[in-house]
Amino acid sequence: MKKMLAALLMSLAFTTAFAIDIGEAKDQGLVGEARTGYLAAVQQPASAEVKALVAEVNAKRKAQFERTAEKTDTTLLQVANRFWELAVERTAPGHYYQDPSGRWTKK
């Protein structure tokens, strides 16, 4: 079950098509993996482009989290928490993630 959950969650980790994509935004330190399991702007105020990217990615993540929770008989919160754990493990050096206290940390 853990492998299935991990595969489902990571399938949407890097999906979207904007003028700036998620990889570029992470490379530039504009966005990172929030403790909630969703993408968030690291720098405030965020540009309209970054806000749009975050909203699009998070809408897809939420939909996937809901499907995964239903398939695995878990809660949305459990799925989001597990996604965050996996995302932090896979965060590239130089990219940001929130630590358990919510502080932005550069890996």
PLM regions: where:
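Positively charged n-region of N-terminal signal peptides that target proteins for export
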Residues: 1-4
